[in-house]
C-alpha cells in the first residue's frame, strides 16, 4: 500500500497557499481577540480574492440549498437536511419527524445539481459521537437510483467517521479519510476529536485521485492500474457496471444514520 500513500509535498504547499491570507473584499477578516494580533479569523462560506483568481466557487453559501437537491428528488428532503448557523446539518435519524403512520419522513443523500469532471473539492466537517457519514463523488444518479431505492448514492466515497467509537474503525478501509471499502488512510493521519472541525480535500483528475485530511495527504490512487482493478474486484462495488470507468458525476453528502455538519464547501475545475 506504500505507493498509494505517497505524500505529495508540492501539492501540500500549493493547497496551503490556495486557502491563505487574502480575503474577499465583501467579507473582511477580523482579528481574533485572544492576545495574538498576528492571528485573524476568516468568514465562513466565502471566497478570498486569491481563491476567486484561482477559479474556486462556493457549493454552499451558508444560507440556502441553491445548487443542491436530494438524489432522486427535485427538491431537498428537508426533514433530514437543515441549514443552521452557516452549516448544512444532517439530522440524526432519531430526530427526523414522523409521519401520521409513525414512519420517518422521507430522506436521502444530498446531491449537487451540477456534475463535475477533473476537480479539486474542499470542505470542513464535524461528526457526532460514534458518527458515520461521507462525501461521495463521480456519482451517477441513474446508476444510484437503479441500485439503491432508498435514494443512496453510488460513487467513490471519502469516509467521515468517529474512529474512536464507531464499529467501522475495525476495517482499515472504512476509517476516516479512506477511499471507502478500497484504500485505508495513511496511519499517520491527524483526525480532530468529535465536535471539532476537520478540513478535507479531494483531488480527482483523469485517472488520478487523492484524499487529504487536515493538511496531509492520506490516500492516493490511480484508476485502471492492476492494483486498483484488484481492489475494486474485492470491494462492494465489484458488480456495479461502469462504476470506475466514468470520469464525471455529482458531488453527494451522505444521508447516514448520524448527525454531521458541513461548511466551507468549495470546488474548482482543474
Annotate each predicted stretch with a short phrase:
Residues 1-8:
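Bacterial N-terminal signal peptides that target proteins for export
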Amino acid at each position: 500500500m506504500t505507493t498509494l500513500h505517497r505524500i505529495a509535498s508540492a501539492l501540500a504547499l500549493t493547497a496551503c497557499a490556495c486557502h491563505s491570507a487574502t480575503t474577499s473584499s465583501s467579507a473582511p477578516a477580523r482579528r481574533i481577540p485572544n492576545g495574538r494580533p498576528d492571528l485573524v479569523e476568516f468568514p465562513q462560506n466565502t471566497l478570498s480574492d486569491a481563491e476567486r483568481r484561482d477559479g474556486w466557487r462556493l457549493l454552499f453559501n451558508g444560507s440556502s440549498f441553491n445548487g443542491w437537491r436530494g438524489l432522486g428528488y427535485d427538491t431537498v428532503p428537508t426533514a433530514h437536511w437543515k441549514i443552521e448557523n452557516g452549516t448544512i446539518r444532517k439530522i440524526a435519524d432519531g430526530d427526523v419527524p414522523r409521519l401520521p403512520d409513525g414512519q420517518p419522513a422521507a430522506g436521502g443523500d444530498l446531491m449537487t445539481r451540477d456534475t463535475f469532471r477533473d476537480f479539486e473539492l474542499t470542505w470542513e466537517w464535524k461528526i457526532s459521537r460514534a458518527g458515520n457519514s461521507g462525501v461521495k463523488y463521480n456519482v451517477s444518479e441513474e446508476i444510484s437510483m437503479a441500485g439503491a431505492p432508498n435514494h443512496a448514492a453510488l460513487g467513490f466515497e471519502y469516509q467521515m467517521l468517529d474512529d474512536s467509537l464507531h464499529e467501522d474503525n475495525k476495517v482499515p478501509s472504512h476509517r476516516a479519510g479512506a477511499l471507502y471499502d478500497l484504500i485505508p488512510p495513511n496511519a499517520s493521519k491527524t483526525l480532530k476529536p468529535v465536535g471539532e472541525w476537520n478540513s478535507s480535500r479531494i483531488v480527482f483528475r483523469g485517472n488520478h485521485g487523492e484524499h487529504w485530511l487536515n493538511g496531509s495527504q492520506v490516500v492516493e490512487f490511480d484508476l485502471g492500474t492492476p492494483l486498483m482493478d484488484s481492489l475494486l474486484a474485492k470491494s462492494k462495488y465489484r458488480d456495479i457496471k461502469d462504476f470506475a470507468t466514468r470520469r464525471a458525476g455529482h458531488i453527494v453528502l451522505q444521508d447516514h444514520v448520524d448527525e454531521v455538519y458541513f461548511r466551507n464547501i468549495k470546488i474548482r475545475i482543474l
